[in-house]
A protein has these predicted regions:
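Active-site proximal loop and beta-alpha junction motif in alpha/beta enzyme cores
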Residues: 1-149, 156-217
Length: 217
């Protein structure tokens, strides 16, 4: 999904490009002059997102995104960690000295491990900090490398570690959830979103035939 934000003196406009849109509406954000509510359907079901803060100059937002419920029975003990599906499968493993940990090497080794299912899983390494928060680094399948942050990965680590405040290289996140009987429900991921770049890539027969200049912000 891509989301382009445009404001003028008359109104706020949100353009959303995704495979399935069920609802889009403007709504005032509490305590601010800017707010959007968005409902969309992804591969793991329906989601609700709200932009709760928007910095027009920096083109940065804070987003509150609802996530899928997670039955406790789906959180499995595997290898030296836990396997959980927060929209896509994530393996979560506790480590020491995360800053110097070989995330790419270990992530690549574990990503296709047969115990993580036929399609493998994203791999998250998490360290508990002295202040009680968590630091997380994620090796993402598909990307096949470490990424700055992964929303479903942050959510997975929060639930597995029963913690709500997560630090990543891409920013700080808060995950809100509660356990009702045997299900983690009312799961919300709250954190930063920013405009990073814009560009166009055209492919023909799986070959890139034209790539426009990419503007990095």
């Amino acid at each position: 999904m891509t989301c382009d934000l445009c404001t003028d003196t008359a109104r706020h406009v949100v353009t959303v490009k995704t495979s399935s849109i069920s609802e889009l509406q403007d709504a005032p954000a509490p305590g601010s002059q800017f707010g959007y509510h968005l409902h969309f359907v992804a591969s793991d079901g329906s989601h609700h997102a709200e932009i709760i803060h928007w910095d027009k100059e920096q083109r940065k937002a804070v987003v509150d995104l609802s996530m899928r419920d997670v039955p406790k029975a789906e959180m499995l003990t595997v290898l030296d960690g836990r396997l959980i599906n927060t929209g896509v499968p994530h393996y979560v493993q506790h480590v020491e000295d995360l800053e110097h940990f070989d995330v790419v090497g270990e992530g690549r080794r574990l990503r296709h491990h047969p115990d993580l299912g036929p399609e493998g899983a994203n791999v998250n390494f998490v360290e508990e900090k002295p202040d009680g928060t968590l630091s997380v680094r994620t090796y993402e399948r598909g990307v096949e490398d470490e990424t700055w942050a992964c929303g479903t990965g942050v959510t997975a680590c929060a639930i597995v570690m029963n913690n709500h405040d997560i630090h990543t290289r891409g920013g700080d996140f808060h995950v809100r959830f509660r356990q009702v009987c045997d299900t983690y429900t009312d799961v919300h991921l709250i954190g930063p979103a920013s405009f990073n770049f814009a560009g166009e890539i055209l492919k023909k027969d799986n070959q890139i035939i034209r790539r426009s200049d990419i503007q990095t912000i």
